[in-house]
Amino acid sequence: MSARGVLAELLWAEKYRPRSLREIVNQEEIVKRLQVFVKEKNMPHLLFAGPPGTGKTTAAHALAHDLYGEDYRLYMLELNASDERGIDVIRTKVKEFARSKLPANVPFKIVLLDEADNMTADAQQALRRLMEMYVDVTRFILIANYPSKIIEPIQSRCAVFRFTQLKKEDVISRLKWICSNEKVVCDDRGLEAIYEVSEGDMRKAINILQAAAALGEVNVSNVYKVVGLATPAEIRALLKSALFEGDFLKARDNLRKLMVSYGLSGVDIIKQLHREIFSSEINMPEEMRVEIADYLGEIQFRLVEGADDEIQLSALLAKLVLLGKPLRQQAQAKPTKVK
């Protein structure tokens, strides 16, 4: 069995990766356009752009599979540009493959450059020249999370496909299908928790599903155990102790327990707080949500710049205690009787 075959047996993300364009989830318009290339046996250079886990690399492999069949890897050079990002790789590996002779009955070869937005500027300039020189025998597929990092001369030579975030119902439907195939017990809340923590990244969602399934059942508790995050209920308790109870010391103790128990960084806490302030479980005026969101952004910036986690998060809790004062006063106010 090949290394990829062994990997597919171990990792569900590989085992259930779509092999053909018709199996790809959600990206209907993109799939239709790519299927035209398959039908015509011709295509331009391509740039696949979009967030992680939306099917960019899968679509590239599926396109090659539908063009060449099961042995498509014989006619494709795949490189991860984040590891092999320098000009030397472009001048050696890529150039040698691009100019090599075409096999019989193959219209063109494919060079797949994953994470192409991590290539150096010099490497991109060299790549641009290769794309011009060998267009008769080789097509390039570039994959990027941040297409703005790809130089304009390359972008102008490519047909750009923008992959969108996967819909919640599509991700959950796929996870349910995998659970059914693997005879895994799951509940809807557990699958929704996977979607939330994976942020629409299908590959990440499937990996979390497999890890949670190893604990026996895919439920909310097991999902948060395997990802090493606090549960939404714990984050809401932290918010309530500061906002609605005004108890700074209790909130700080809760914060420390979460950071120790789960090994959370300050940025992890900020991200979870940001998600929960917009939860329907937290009842507060819209203006207050906006003000808290703005302050969370400021605290995150400080943390990324190297500020101390505990000091910044303590400052955040103090801010929440102050912001929550009108809510506490309103809750304590007794209605006056009308005579």
Model-identified regions with their sequence ranges:
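Short loop-to-helix capping motifs
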Residues: 27, 200-201
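P-loop/Walker A NTP-binding region and its immediately flanking N-terminal helices
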Residues: 1-160, 170, 296, 300, ...
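Conserved ATP-binding/catalytic motifs of P-loop helicase motor domains
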Residues: 234
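Helix-rich C-terminal "collar"/helical-bundle subdomain used as an assembly and partner-interaction module
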Residues: 238-339
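Conserved AAA+ ATPase core "coupling" helix
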Residues: 91, 151-196, 205-208
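C-terminal helical "lid" of AAA+/P-loop NTPase domains
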Residues: 111, 191-197, 203-217, 224-225, ...
